[in-house]
Structure formats: C-alpha cells, structure tokens
Regions:
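Internal, active-site/partner-interface "lid" segment
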Residues: 185, 197-236
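Structured adenosyl-cofactor binding patch, chiefly the S-adenosyl-L-methionine
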Residues: 160, 164-211
C-alpha cells in the first residue's frame, strides 16, 4: 500500500507516522508513506496556495491549482519521494520547478529507498474535512487494502476551493465534530488507523479484531502482572485457564462498558 499526504505542513503528518508500529511497517516494506509540501506545486514565485474568497468572507481559501497539479502529478507518474522530516518546514527554491521540488522529497519508509508498493494502483483521493463522513473503525477497514493507493489532502485556513471537492476528491473524511488548525493531524490519525489494519503490521493477528469498535463493542478490560496491587485483584476468571469462561466474561464486560459509555453503538434492544 502507498499513501501520499499533501499538506502545507507535511512534518506534522509525517512525524508520528515514522514512529512505533507504523514506522516499523514502513521499514518492513508493508506500506510506503510519503508526505509532500503542497507549495511544491504552487505556480508563482511566492509559492502561494491561498487567496481571498469570492463573495467576501473572513479568512483565506486554499486555491484549486496546487491541489489539481499535485494530484495529477502523483497519479500520472511514479512519485519520486515524500518530504523528509528534517526538510518538511525548510522547502526552498522555485515554485515552478517541479523537479527541484521533487528532489527534496524523500521516502519516509527506510532510509530514502523507494518502495514499489501501490505505485501502479489507481489512487483514491481523500480530503480530511470536518464536513466529511465521520471516521470510524469500519471506514478504516474499508481503506486498509494491501496494494492500494491513497492520496490524502489536508485543508487549512477557511477551507478549500469547492472545485477541488467537486472534481478531484473521491471521499471526505472527518475524525470528529471539532475543528483543527489544519488537516495534517487528521491525516496522521486517518493513516495510522488504516495502516495498522494491514496484514502483518500488528505483531498479533488477533490484535486488530480485538480492538474497540471492531466487534461493534468497546474493548473488554485488560490486566497484567501483578495479580494483586494495593488490594485490587485481577478477576479470578482470567486466572482460571478456562478459555470459554474467559471469552464469555470479556464479551459481557465489553457489553457492559458499551452500554455505560457508548450506548449509541448498540441496537435499541441491547441498550438497557
């Protein structure tokens, strides 16, 4: 799988994805993640990506040209690289010199080595937007397709020219009913949730199915050593070795927690 992220602040999206399980997945060749500076596709010498809105309003709107040219460039040719963490906020040079911009973008996966993952697959374009459909585990699983390709667009300022949404974007995704300063953080959340569901990313194949929401319930309580701490003891059933009883206990506790914390996840007849 290959994921390209387009942002004015690529380091914000890239940094968390270079760590932990997602970073290891890239090193192992399970996914290739590239963060690009949208200004590399701006047309003027100032590398402008925003302008005042028609009709009058507060703030600035992101221009359509950089998005179209960036996505078409990434779709139509093998992308050179993704923005390296140390260079993400230090992009210089001519805005019209695409090759110069491309020479600065480096693969985040493993020491700059280009990974042939999803490069030839049709790219689906996702816009991170508070106006999008609410992101959940079901949508994460929908996008976690080995060998597929995603291009993730990050908004900023007051929004994006509607022509980008109408004619370039395949899906709008919101990570919640709140507004961030830019879409790079949302892109990192989206990418992490998707990539961890790819086969081989998590060490235990059962880890993802046991996650909260995967079964429609919140996750059951977890315990580890010591058996007793400050008078609080691990439930005896978890020490019994009876796998059937343990499974029943876990499902019951998951159901109880879901009823208490997120009853909206349950059918009407199971909320009481």
């Amino acid at each position: 799988m290959r994921i390209d992220i387009l942002s004015l602040f690529p380091a914000i999206a890239a940094a968390p994805l270079a760590e932990s399980m997602i970073g290891k997945a890239q090193q192992r060749g399970l996914v290739s993640i590239h963060a690009h500076n949208l200004r590399d596709w701006a047309r003027d010498k100032h590398r402008t990506t925003d302008d005042a809105p028609y009709g009058g309003s507060q703030g600035m709107v992101m221009k359509c040209e950089p998005f179209f040219e960036a996505v078409e460039s990434l779709r139509d040719r093998r992308p050179e690289t993704g923005t390296h963490l140390t260079e993400a906020n230090d992009q210089t040079g001519s805005a019209n010199d695409e090759e110069a911009g491309a020479s600065k973008r480096k693969d985040l996966s493993s020491g700059g080595e280009e990974l042939d993952l999803g490069v030839n697959a049709p790219a689906r374009v996702v816009l991170m937007s508070p106006a999008g459909r609410r992101f959940d585990q079901r949508i994460a699983a929908e996008y976690a397709v080995p060998g597929s390709r995603l291009i993730v667009l990050c908004g900023h300022y007051e929004g994006i020219d509607q022509r980008v949404i109408d004619h370039l974007v395949d899906d709008e995704i919101s990570i919640g009913d709140y507004v961030l300063t830019n879409g790079a953080l949302a892109a990192a959340v989206f990418t992490d949730a998707v990539v961890r569901l790819l086969p081989g990313v998590l060490g235990d194949a059962q880890s993802a199915p046991d996650d909260s929401f995967s079964s429609g319930l919140l996750e059951f309580p977890q315990y580890t050593r010591p058996v007793e701490y400050r008078g609080w003891r691990v439930p005896d059933v978890l020490l019994s070795g009876n796998h059937g009883a343990i499974a029943d206990w876990r499902r019951q506790k998951a159901l109880e927690k879901t009823r208490r914390v997120r009853p909206d996840l349950l059918p009407e007849d199971k909320r009481l």
